[in-house]
């Protein structure tokens, strides 16, 4: 079988692949042999007389698998690998949910252990919902100012 070096080189250049990714249809070798210009080769590629195998990339599957394994152990999640603000890693909603759950849990405990009465509980609950308290220590200092022993 002839090598068709010129045709192979032109086809590889046109398709943007390596020389080994170019194959010729065995039934149409005479047409391929006559093709000497880029236009001829383009026409033959369209007619499937010159077959172009797609370019093969480098698979990143194994890399992703390895990274996932390391991340599940907690590697690559510490300060040196972090980019962006803390708010980019944990959203505002998640921060709010954690804060409100903590405060509500605490004031529920106070009510159940008779440290505060149900009216004070309701007042604190409403204020917590309205974002009156910055954090749990803010709730505690508010209660101290109200005269409760916390």
UniProtKB/Swiss-Prot annotation:
PROSITE patterns for this protein: RIBOSOMAL_L19E
Region Disordered: which residues? 56-90
Top-level lineage group: Archaea
Family to which this protein belongs: Belongs to the eukaryotic ribosomal protein eL19 family.
Oligomeric state and interaction partners are given as:
Part of the 50S ribosomal subunit.
- General function of this protein: Binds to the 23S rRNA.
Q: What is this protein called?
A: Large ribosomal subunit protein eL19
């Amino acid at each position: 079988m002839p090598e068709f070096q010129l045709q192979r080189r032109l086809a590889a250049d046109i398709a943007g692949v390596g020389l080994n990714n170019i194959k010729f249809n065995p039934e149409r070798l005479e047409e391929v042999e006559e093709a000497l210009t880029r236009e001829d080769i383009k026409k033959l590629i369209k007619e499937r007389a010159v077959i172009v195998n797609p370019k093969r990339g480098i698979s990143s599957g194994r890399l992703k698998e390895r990274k996932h394994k390391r991340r599940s152990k907690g590697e690559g999640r510490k300060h040196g690998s972090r980019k962006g603000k803390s708010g980019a890693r944990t959203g505002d909603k998640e921060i709010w949910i954690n804060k409100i759950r903590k405060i509500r849990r605490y004031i529920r405990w106070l009510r159940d252990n008779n440290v505060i009465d149900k009216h004070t509980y309701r007042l604190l609950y409403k204020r917590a919902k309205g974002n009156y308290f910055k954090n749990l220590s803010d709730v505690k200092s508010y209660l101290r100012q109200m005269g409760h022993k916390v």
